[in-house]
């Protein structure tokens, strides 16, 4: 079984990593945007660290290791040009039956004027452009250290009136807990699915293969310094390297930082998190800031509820 799994993984890696770089050849670019402030603060190097409802985006297999019954996540990204990117998700641990999850991601623009060559100042009409993702996930523990999971997604893209398209995608992931110094490994095939057509051009989904690892650099009591590294190979560009660090103080205050290697614009990232109890319920809130060189910076904030 292990040999067969390694063979399949090797074939997938070969197929994905051997693809030519084709910038501008894929649609639904909003699927590439980090949804979690904690993850974004670590430059997105989060596949082996992700837990709870946020893991539905980074590594659905991870929800099989949830310690709580329910986890709710609400995050928002202040993207460029006034664009908002929202993420809401729920994860449920059903014990021996496995873990289930559902997510909703949307990217919407501000209201824009309809302009034509004859009426460059506007026709009096307005419109919005939006992209949406709805996903259902399932994950299960195969052993006490190995998890497998997957997500089926429905993608809807609305640019303007008749320029609307739908697609379905599949994501599969696996994670392995070494059990020593917090070391974990994870991998994922993301956004594998149907293509969409706008006017006369066909665009594929932004399929990618991700691999990551993490572990504790320092641990003394409840104070931990964690480091992570990841590599992402998209089907429309060169490999991207990610690295992140997190300092946890008494599992209450979290300081994070990260850096992107090989990305055309993204560079450093930083953020902070706070975990606390309110009305007997455990909660956490996070904030991050990411630099995109000449484009400027983006910020994210989010809240997690644990039941």
Regions found by a protein language model. Name each.
Residues 5, 14-15, 274:
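Short non-domain terminal segments
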Residues 10-18:
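Hydrophobic h-region of N-terminal signal peptides that target proteins for export
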Residues 19-307:
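Subset of outer-membrane beta-barrel
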Residues 2-9:
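Sec-dependent signal peptide recognition
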